[in-house]
Amino acid sequence: MTSVNPSSSKPSALILLPAVDVVEGRAVRLVQGQAGSETEYGSALDAAMTWQRDGAEWIHLVDLDAAFGRGSNRELLAEVVGKLDVAVELSGGIRDDDSLAAALATGCARVNLGTAALENPQWCAKVVAEHGDKVAVGLDVKIVDGQHRLRGRGWETDGGDLWTVLDRLDGEGCSRFVVTDVTKDGTLNGPNLELLTQVCERTDAPVIASGGVSSLDDLRAIATLTDRGVEGAIVGKALYAGRFTLPQALDAVGP
């Protein structure tokens, strides 16, 4: 079994984070983050356990109901984290002290803030200062008329200019950014390498790539950016759709 060690001294090894996006307890994938575009892939716990069995060292676990503000899967996500032996990055609807405390209490390795970083900058700065490496910030980007705009609340609202927000968060000491081109996510149309490169040029914090991965060649292309600051890649629909297996992906980007 080939795996990627996050603590490896070899900078070329890209960390892969299989995604488990959860709606009403089920693993789903969306197209461009649109509510109602779900394709269901069964139990969230079964999906997560499958990726662990196949060699994942990280899982990207997302509560889409909480992200869209239409409920939550809090108890289920806590159960999933508790049953996994691998590190979990937990995302979706973490916007205040209560939801943050619940997320951290699951024992996850890291939480991913999204909307909160856009709508409540002071709270976000406090959380980043208090929790350091346990907090990443998701930058969900939609390029509109050449402008890089951030999207919030399940990608339904405008969250301002990417570069302005990135500079602010970087100055506040954010330890890691998860960068998604929302026009690519769930489309299997390939990642936005230019966007990833541009973000890496603006921050020394590690970057996790998300959205558009459709092939092993896409992963290899992202892996060429590790020396620029791309640390990992979230892989979702390509795995669920059988474009490649996780062991194949780990082998493609491993040391």
Curated annotation (Swiss-Prot):
It catalyses: 1-(5-phospho-beta-D-ribosyl)-5-[(5-phospho-beta-D-ribosylamino)methylideneamino]imidazole-4-carboxamide = 5-[(5-phospho-1-deoxy-D-ribulos-1-ylimino)methylamino]-1-(5-phospho-beta-D-ribosyl)imidazole-4-carboxamide; N-(5-phospho-beta-D-ribosyl)anthranilate = 1-(2-carboxyphenylamino)-1-deoxy-D-ribulose 5-phosphate. Its main location: cytoplasm. Keywords: Amino-acid biosynthesis, Aromatic amino acid biosynthesis, Cytoplasm, Histidine biosynthesis, Isomerase, Tryptophan biosynthesis. It is an enzyme of class 5 (isomerase). SUPFAM superfamilies: Ribulose-phoshate binding barrel (SSF51366). PANTHER family: 1-(5-PHOSPHORIBOSYL)-5-[(5-PHOSPHORIBOSYLAMINO)METHYLIDENEAMINO] IMIDAZOLE-4-CARBOXAMIDE ISOMERASE. This is Phosphoribosyl isomerase A. It comes from Mycolicibacterium vanbaalenii (strain DSM 7251 / JCM 13017 / BCRC 16820 / KCTC 9966 / NRRL B-24157 / PYR-1).
